[in-house]
Amino acid sequence: MNLSKHFTVAEMTRTSTGLPNVPTGVSLSALTVLCATLLEPVRERFGPVAVHSGYRGPEVNAATPGASRHSQHMLGQAADFHVVGQTLETVFRWIVNESNLQYGQAILEGRAPGKPTWIHLSLGAPYRVGSACQQALVFDGQRYAPYRV
């Protein structure tokens, strides 16, 4: 089932845990909005997007190392990805500085200092409000810091 032109439910729910990971109702709706309003513009600008993690049900989230107990992934509101053939920094800079995307958080993430491995992008308003929107951060595997141009 397609969520948008280029993204499917299967792609956005893939997990290596072996646990059931099926979004329903509100989570499925949020996934559709996420794909249409955030991931599609990235794909249109740069080309194919490889999703590392989309929806994560509570069991899958609990089995994911380093995942927040309050992750927007559990609500279908976030995705971790990279763009095939593009540097993470190029895509991230475009999202934060050049696009008009209305995101909640854009995070350049990695598990080793100075080595980002994916971009986390989550829905903004009305899913997040106020200062929790348009947050651009860098995560080095230990701490979050504001993104600096």
Regions found by a protein language model. Name each.
Residues 1-44, 136-149:
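Extracytoplasmic cell-surface/polysaccharide-interacting catalytic and binding patches
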Residues 3, 60, 70:
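Glycine-rich, flexible loop/turn motifs
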Residues 23-24, 50-56, 90-95:
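N-terminal start-of-chain detector that recognizes signal peptides
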Residues 34-38, 60, 77, 87, ...:
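Amphipathic alpha-helical interface surfaces
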Residues 39-66:
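Extended, low-complexity, intrinsically disordered C-terminal regulatory tails
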Residues 46, 74-78:
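Short connector loops at helix/strand junctions that flank enzyme active sites
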Residues 66-72:
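Non-catalytic scaffold segments within catalytic domains of secreted glycoside hydrolases
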Residues 70, 79, 83-149:
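Catalytic cores and adjacent binding grooves of peptidoglycan-active enzymes
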